[in-house]
């Protein structure tokens, strides 16, 4: 099972479990391209097929939010294991978004506020790994997951300041990745390097045009 490295609250999450209970998802809205795409479609896709399926959604989202499509794609690849992780397959959750993030005080969330999947995960606290059951957001489509993730990156607060301030005003993927790292998105030191490699290897910047 793919390991997902994600930091929603300044702690690393290593997700290897699968959903054990779920609530029904809401209907997706606000995204037209690929709005009905389900993560189950990724199960037998090649890497290029995955990029071709998610790319148009990421590009449209970039035009709306300023979060580069290349960054969205690289994060989705890294955090969902090319869409094949247990959480992604069961819940269309491409980024390991928990039900509670930054106090849920940020605007523009595409999540319905109630649909979730309970997943067993291994989290790291002060260098020690523990297994817990956590609640993760469940989405009606891949597009809804991407929209919610971009809203979080655009509007999440850290006190009185935006957690990822300046992210949506730069068109440099390296700068966006640096802002994510500085904002505490992921505590794994190799995160930016890993995403940079994915962007270059699969020519993900082509979706930023």
Give, region by region, the residue ranges found by the protein language model.
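Catalytic cores of secreted/periplasmic lytic hydrolases that degrade extracellular macromolecules
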Residues: 2-209
């Amino acid at each position: 099972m793919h390991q997902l490295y994600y930091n929603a609250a300044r702690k690393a999450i290593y997700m290897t479990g699968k959903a054990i209970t779920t609530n029904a998802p809401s209907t997706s809205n606000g995204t037209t391209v690929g709005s009905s795409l389900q993560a189950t479609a990724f199960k037998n896709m090649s890497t290029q097929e995955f990029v071709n399926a998610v790319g148009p959604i990421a590009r449209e989202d970039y035009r709306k939010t300023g979060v580069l499509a290349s960054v969205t794609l690289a994060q989705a690849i890294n955090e969902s294991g090319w869409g094949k992780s247990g959480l992604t397959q069961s819940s269309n959750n491409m980024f390991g978004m928990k039900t509670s993030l930054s106090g849920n005080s940020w605007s523009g969330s595409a999540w319905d506020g109630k649909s979730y999947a309970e997943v067993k995960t291994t989290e790291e606290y002060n260098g020690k790994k523990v297994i817990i059951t956590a609640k993760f957001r469940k989405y009606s489509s891949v597009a809804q997951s991407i929209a919610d993730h971009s809203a979080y990156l655009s509007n999440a607060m850290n006190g009185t300041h935006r957690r990822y301030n300046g992210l949506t005003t730069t068109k440099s993927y390296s700068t966006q990745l640096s802002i994510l790292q500085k904002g505490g998105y992921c505590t794994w030191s190799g995160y930016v390097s890993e995403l940079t490699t994915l962007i270059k290897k699969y020519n993900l910047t082509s979706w930023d045009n």
